[in-house]
A protein has these predicted regions:
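Cleavable N-terminal export/targeting peptides
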Residues: 1-47, 319-330
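Subset of outer-membrane beta-barrel
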Residues: 41-330
Length: 330
């Protein structure tokens, strides 16, 4: 994850007080834990944010770049907001791997003229405790990472959809160190008739620099995705697949499906292939919707790190007020 202090040479260490040594040891221990348990590449700042958001998408194994038809599209593929025609409010909460790492998201999207507009807030945090060189516990603290993102999407001459995010990152070590930085995402989505769709995204283009108040810097690594989706049986069945790329090497592969047994009930499943397709883990989930209220749950079966339960809810104000048509299948 992040490094809140610049490296200390031997002369500096000799002058550090016992209290500061406890802070340094405790902070480094926490950083090692967070880096080890993060999904995806698991390296770099804001690693937990690479997991994605929303129980619906995560239950499909994260294969959502070419789907992107709900409020979480602002993270998965900002271009997807241009295919909505109502106002939506959504949120997500989870404890990653059951290890006390909280990951939350709240967002709102709407349409204006030919544009899709979104505003979201994402947060990840973990509580820790300073430990001195003798192993004795000291002060408790909470490491927090947040991002505020604004999304704009539009239709490009009826050829496809394009979208972009501007993100403001903030980090707080809980020990008096803070950092921030701006990042940018781009997304494209092309519907090939009523059945096929393809999408590509570039998140944190060229890497996002996070600057600490003390002068140190960290980087949110760039991540690039390409995906395709098929909508069958009048949109009641969705099959999707995504591929990750870090700019140098291929990353994880994501395959997922969603089947609406009836309009009000959907079942989902997916698989994520990791480590050059040598390892994998599964995801399952379900969702219900009643009069524009969508409630979704996902369960990530990650044997090594631990299982994760994700809960999400989304309101479609257009549906509730009778003012919009349903575009995506939730």
């Amino acid at each position: 994850m992040m490094t809140p202090e610049a490296p200390l040479d031997d002369n500096t260490l000799k002058g550090v007080t016992t209290t500061m040594k406890r802070v340094i040891v405790g902070t480094l221990a926490l950083l090692m834990v967070i880096s080890a348990i993060a999904l995806a590449d698991g390296v770099g700042a804001f690693s937990a944010f690479k997991n994605g958001i929303g129980a619906r998408a995560l239950a499909m194994g994260g294969a959502f770049v070419a789907v992107g038809d709900d409020a979480t599209a602002m993270v998965w593929n900002p271009a997807g907001l241009a295919q909505l025609n109502d106002t939506r409010l959504g949120g997500m909460s989870t404890d990653l791997f059951g290890l006390g790492i909280t990951h939350q998201f709240v967002g709102a999207v709407t349409t204006f003229a030919n544009f899709g507009i979104g505003l979201g807030w994402e947060r990840a945090s973990v509580a820790g405790q300073v430990v001195d060189e003798e192993g004795e516990a000291g002060d408790a603290f909470t490491w927090t990472e947040q991002a505020i993102l604004g999304t704009l999407a539009t239709n490009i001459m009826d050829i496809g959809l394009a979208g972009a995010n501007v993100k403001y990152y903030m980090a707080d070590s809980g020990l008096g160190d803070t950092a921030d930085g701006f990042g940018f995402d781009l997304g494209l989505l092309v519907n090939l008739g009523d059945i096929f769709a393809v999408g590509v995204t570039a998140t944190d283009l060229a890497g996002t620099t996070i600057s600490w108040a003390g002068g140190a810097t960290d980087v949110v690594s760039g991540l690039y995705k390409a995906g395709m989706a098929m909508k069958l049986v009048d949109g009641m069945l969705i099959l999707a697949a995504d591929m990750d790329f870090d700019g140098t090497n291929l990353g994880d592969a994501h395959v997922g499906m969603e089947f609406n047994i009836i309009k009000e009930l959907a079942l989902r499943g997916g698989v994520v292939l990791t480590n050059s397709f040598q390892d994998y883990y599964f995801a399952v989930g379900a969702g219900i919707n009643v009069a524009g209220l969508y409630v979704d749950a996902a369960y990530i079966l990650e044997e090594t790190l631990g299982n994760t339960l994700i809960l999400s809810a989304e309101f479609s104000l257009g549906d509730l007020l009778g003012g919009g048509e349903e575009v995506g299948t939730e």
